[in-house]
Amino acid sequence: MRMLIFTYKLERYIKNKILPKILVVPDRDKYQIKGSFRRRIPYITDIDIVNNVHPEYDDTNIYQRIVDLINSFTNDNQIKLIYVICGTDDRFLLTEYSDEEIEKIKILLNPTELVELNNVLSKYQDDLNKKVFYINEIIWDLYKLRWTSSEVLAGKKILRGGIEVSFQDVVKNNSILLLQYFVKIEYYPIGFDIAVRYKPINLITAYQNAAFYQLKLANYSKEYYFMLFPLRFYFKNDPTISKQLEYIIETKFGLYKQLLVRIDSYRTIYESGNLDLDTAKSIIISIIKDIRKLNGIDMNIIDKIQEVSNNSAGQDKIIAWNTLLTQLYTNINKSVNKQSKKYFTRYINIIPKEDRKLCCLEEEHVLQSGGINFESTNFLTKKKLIY
């Protein structure tokens, strides 16, 4: 068995052995575990933590602490700091979504991004909400600054168009940064997202924004499994239905979600340039072991992955696996959403029609639009922490 299952022993290991290495301040009263790991969900996907480090650290000394953290595990094969996310490139900040604003960002996009933007402008010219949403999908990674370890150590980053920004200047103009780690736990790496709050700030609005974003994405992408998440939120005060939805999402289909996250982890580490062959192998082996437990999966893709394992070498393996995992992701996503349709239909029909818009859920819209768009942006890979 390669799947990572929650146990109290594992929880103690993470709290006692991992968090002291990766948190800015590891004192127990200085961090809160959020999300599914806090709820002790069986299938572990990733771990979200808020680390409150003020007043011990603020914008005058947090930079050196991040540098010390990076240096402390430079030779630690278990821990990879993929990105430090802090600051924005306000050239990509749209307020009115006017033609003038959009033309200004077009000159900063690469050819692929430009094609995507033009497609959105054409497809959603009569739907402002969706146009705004999908434009932000395209430019989000350009707007939010993602710093590699080497850029943090250098103290600077070169943006599109050759503009240089200072890490310390960015830190002074913000209140929170995100440390995006991957840590090998047992068989393969899982993600740790550490939100480091180094100035007094209320995060309620940030969490509300993130939750509302996820609600819209679940609806816009027409994916029944991910649309169960806002249903669970809606029924949070009904213990019976909430428990039923929790079981469906996290236990019945928990391995589907975990495998989707594993594939996304592979792709994220690969795209960051941090994926070595041993890490790639560990993820691939774990996927091959566990994928056979799922229903509705095209095993031809698995056969191709195994063929690459047997016949390709070195970097060629990593590249070929990345391509095949993209196909497998779509296949798993399609399967779990098809199986979830009956549950979505059952619970959406309990909600009064006047409340469905509050949940960004309208069954009629989903069905009339032609069903699920499996090629669309999906709920998991675009999970955002909006700070």
Swiss-Prot record:
Recorded GO cellular component terms are: virion component
State its location(s): Virion
Name the domain of life this protein comes from: Viruses
Keyword Nucleotidyltransferase listed: no
Q: What is its main location?
A: virion
User: Known Pfam families for this protein?
Assistant: L544_helical, L544_NTransf
> Is Transmembrane helix given among the entry's keywords?
no
Q: What is this protein called?
A: Uncharacterized protein L544
Which keywords does the record carry?
A: Virion
Q: Which organism is it from?
A: Acanthamoeba polyphaga mimivirus
